[in-house]
């Protein structure tokens, strides 16, 4: 199947390189657009009772550091049809919205072989809602 627009769910971790390389290979083969998608789920808001005066500054600093890492990853991709989307929202809803807006016909995401992921894989909630093909790349935990 020929893909026109490939979405890649990235987290800002080292494993992103594996996902991006797989997606980039497919994008080059299909002359497709490549969109890296990062969802900032605002996990820091889960603990609203924990607060100290510098909380906002620290959270902003961490977000900037994370975003810079993602921008650097995107900049290093040697493919002119590449872009990065960083959105605030919840998984999988926000990811599905972006996939639809971008008209992606393939989603590339990763999977850790851990006990918790066997019980509750992140992609389980989107399989029945996703209108694109799904490529799940296994991560080998060390």
From Swiss-Prot:
<comment type="similarity">
    <text>Belongs to the universal stress protein A family.</text>
</comment>
<dbReference type="InterPro" id="IPR014729">
    <property type="entry name" value="Rossmann-like_a/b/a_fold"/>
</dbReference>
<dbReference type="InterPro" id="IPR006016">
    <property type="entry name" value="UspA"/>
</dbReference>
<protein>
    <recommendedName>
        <fullName>Universal stress protein D</fullName>
    </recommendedName>
</protein>
<keyword id="KW-0963">Cytoplasm</keyword>
<dbReference type="InterPro" id="IPR006015">
    <property type="entry name" value="Universal_stress_UspA"/>
</dbReference>
<comment type="function">
    <text>Required for resistance to DNA-damaging agents.</text>
</comment>
<dbReference type="Pfam" id="PF00582">
    <property type="entry name" value="Usp"/>
</dbReference>
<dbReference type="GO" id="GO:0005737">
    <property type="term" value="C:cytoplasm"/>
</dbReference>
């Amino acid at each position: 199947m020929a893909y026109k627009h490939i979405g890649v769910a990235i987290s800002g971790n080292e494993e992103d390189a594996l996902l991006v390389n797989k997606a980039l290979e497919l994008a080059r083969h299909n002359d497709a657009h490549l969109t890296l998608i990062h969802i900032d789920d605002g996990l820091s808001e889960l603990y609203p009772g924990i607060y100290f005066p510098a909380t906002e500054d620290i959270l902003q600093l961490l977000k900037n550091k994370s975003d810079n890492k993602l921008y650097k990853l995107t900049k290093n991709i040697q493919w002119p049809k590449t872009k990065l989307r960083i959105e605030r929202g919840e998984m999988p809803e926000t990811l599905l919205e972006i996939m639809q807006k971008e008209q992606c016909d393939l989603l590339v995401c990763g999977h850790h072989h851990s006990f918790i992921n066997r019980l509750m894989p992140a992609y389980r909630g989107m399989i029945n809602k996703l209108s694109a093909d799904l490529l799940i790349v296994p991560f080998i935990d060390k």
